[in-house]
């Protein structure tokens, strides 16, 4: 498995759109190093992150914040993910809020799952694939399904490398786009930029 990420030269800047550093990741140790910086999972024209500049990707990231339930027994852990997806290739890096209280909610596992996919140059297909994964695995964050999503850098522990023999895109079906109401919401979630 080889995941291609693009990293920024900064950490924690949500307004940044420049990701000039290519990281070809082939191990947990390389992932752990790459995700210390803000990063994206696609290449963009002029290294400028936007859907319109999407050039290509061979990896997509899904966010698991475990905010789908307050019952700790129902929280997704790397071990549970391994049971659900034993044959699928992916890697895990913990988020900057892993096991920390946030917005008054109890500490819980929070991590990003980096799925290897067949390379694509189609931003709409890429976003549709993220929606298809969310439909099948609804514990993932439905607010992070676009083709220009960035991830805050974090240095919070060992990454996990799960080498499988399948890619996630061979395991999900792309259907119709997720319905969003007039406020940009899926259920009770407000989509970024619609407040």
Identify the function of each model-found stretch.
Residues 1-111, 115-128, 186-195:
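Signature for HUH/AEP ssDNA processing cores
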Residues 23, 48, 130, 138-141, ...:
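Generic alpha-helical secondary structure signal
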Residues 50, 95, 141, 146, ...:
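Alpha-helix initiation/capping motif
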Residues 78-79, 114-140, 159-180:
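Helical (often loop-to-helix) elements that flank the catalytic cores of nucleotide-handling enzymes
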Residues 143-160:
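Short proline/glycine- and acidic-rich turn/helix-capping motifs at secondary-structure junctions
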Residues 171-172, 177-195:
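Extended intrinsically disordered terminal tails
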């Amino acid at each position: 498995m080889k995941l291609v990420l693009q990293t920024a030269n900064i950490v924690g800047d949500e307004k940044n759109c420049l990701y000039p550093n290519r990281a070809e990741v082939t191990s947990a140790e390389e992932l752990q190093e790459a995700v210390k910086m803000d990063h994206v999972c696609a290449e963009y024209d002029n290294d400028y992150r936007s859907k319109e500049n999407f050039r290509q990707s061979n990896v997509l990231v899904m966010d698991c914040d475990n905010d789908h339930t307050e019952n700790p027994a129902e929280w997704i852990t790397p071990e549970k993910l391994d049971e659900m997806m034993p044959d699928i290739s992916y890697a895990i890096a913990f988020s900057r809020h892993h096991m920390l209280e946030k917005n008054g909610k109890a500490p819980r596992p929070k991590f990003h799952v980096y799925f290897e996919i067949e390379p694509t140059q189609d931003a709409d297909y890429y976003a549709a694939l993220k929606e298809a994964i969310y439909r099948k695995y609804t514990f993932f964050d439905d607010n992070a399904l676009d083709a220009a999503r960035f991830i805050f850098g974090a240095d919070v522990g060992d990454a996990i490398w799960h080498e499988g023999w399948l890619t996630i895109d061979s395991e999900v079906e792309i259907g119709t786009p997720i319905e969003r109401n007039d406020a940009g919401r899926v259920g009770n979630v407000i989509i970024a930029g619609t407040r």
